[in-house]
Amino acid sequence: MQKATYYDNSGLFGGYSYPKPDSYSYGPAHQSYPTANIESDYQGPVCPIQTPAVRPPALKDTDLNGDCMRQSSSQSSNSGTQAGSISEQQAPPLSASPPSSNSSASQKKKSPSGGASGAATPALTKQIFPWMKETRQNSKQKSNNCGEVSDEKSPPGPASKRVRTAYTSAQLVELEKEFHFNRYLCRPRRVEMANLLNLTERQIKIWFQNRRMKYKKDQKSKGLAHSPLGHSPDRSPPLSGPNHVGYSGQLQNVNSLSYDAPSPPSFAKPQQNMYGLAAYTAPLGGCIPQQKRYPGSEYEHHGMQSNGGFANANLQGSPVYVGGNFVDSMPASGPMFNLGHLPHPSSTSVDYSCAAQIPGNHHHGPCDPHPTYTDLTSHQASQGRIQEAPKLTHL
């Protein structure tokens, strides 16, 4: 059997170029050196012949046995003696007993360096560098995969920023639906929504706060879009001048108009701001049944007759006409407007200066040559009728 293994080994390793046998020293010390390196972790091309103190890296167990068998087969083939080859073949199995002592000695020699390296290795593994630490974003992703809510976790450091909560579309639909019916949630409903949507009460509360602020902002923007000037639409525009007319809010309050009777204006002024009767029939027609009582006087309102100068039937008993520049070609033979007995309260600034303009020598309807603007004090009992005194506001 020994011959067979010998010849097989020589056939397997015959292609190797072996060194000359003169360069090796054979002796009893030859069997001790491979045993010292059997369990070592060092790796080398061949089995070394030097002492363990200067030993180069060696192979592991399987490689070591193969190399030693290779070298022993080369030595035996070169020497040509079967006994030498058999002893070399038996060397690895026989040297299996001493490895304990030799390996322990080598372990003792290696212990200082090995202990230092072993101590350095745990130190390297225990040291955690900043880029190895787990960031909050990674922990959020992991917790989301596990189904946990990341907002409830306290941040790792005081400087870390809270990550925004990403709501799903289903959660947003439910929250918007709830906001449509109730802008403020009570506590039981909030708990119910939190259980339904798999959120926390704090998240739902914060979402509703943000949604209310968004709603208020939208309402403000809509309000500014509807009234760009910043005032309400029903507000009348300010008076820009003495001839500016504000009909809208003041024609309904004709009853409260106080009558101002200043000194009579000059009659032959150029044609401007004339008042045609057609311009007054529509806005003042609704004031027919109203009865006037002048402040401080006791004159009862009567219907005007056909000779009153204003021939339009719709305007009989209508309020007085305020004329800024009253243009009439009436002769001055009749009595003028002696209205000094009437009180003069503060007059509201109503000025109908936007009526239709007509030529300068036009009358206000078919008028008698003698006007019937009578003095209210002297003709009250004789005529049997009382005309309204026109309010003449000289502007």
Swiss-Prot record:
- Name a GO CC annotation attached to this entry: nucleus
Location within or outside the cell: Nucleus
What start and end residues bound the annotated signal peptide?
none
Enumerate the UniProt keywords alphabetically: Developmental protein, DNA-binding, Homeobox, Nucleus, Transcription, Transcription regulation
What family name appears in the similarity comment? Belongs to the Antp homeobox family.
Region spans: Disordered: 1-122, 135-163, 217-247, 363-395
Q: What is its main location?
A: nucleus
What biological-process terms (Gene Ontology) are attached?
anterior/posterior pattern specification; embryonic skeletal system morphogenesis; regulation of transcription by RNA polymerase II
- SUPFAM superfamilies of this UniProt entry? Homeodomain-like (SSF46689)
Biased segments, Polar residues type? 138-147, 374-385
Record field: compositional bias (Low complexity): 71-122
Q: Which domain of life is it from?
A: Eukaryota
Function summary = Sequence-specific transcription factor which is part of a developmental regulatory system that provides cells with specific positional identities on the anterior-posterior axis.
Q: What is the lineage of its organism?
A: Eukaryota, Metazoa, Chordata, Craniata, Vertebrata
Task: Return the motif ranges for Antp-type hexapeptide.
Answer: 128-133
Q: Does the keyword DNA-binding apply?
A: yes
GO MF annotation: an example: RNA polymerase II cis-regulatory region sequence-specific DNA binding
What ranges are recorded for DNA binding?
Answer: 160-219
Q: What is the protein's given name?
A: Homeobox protein Hox-D3
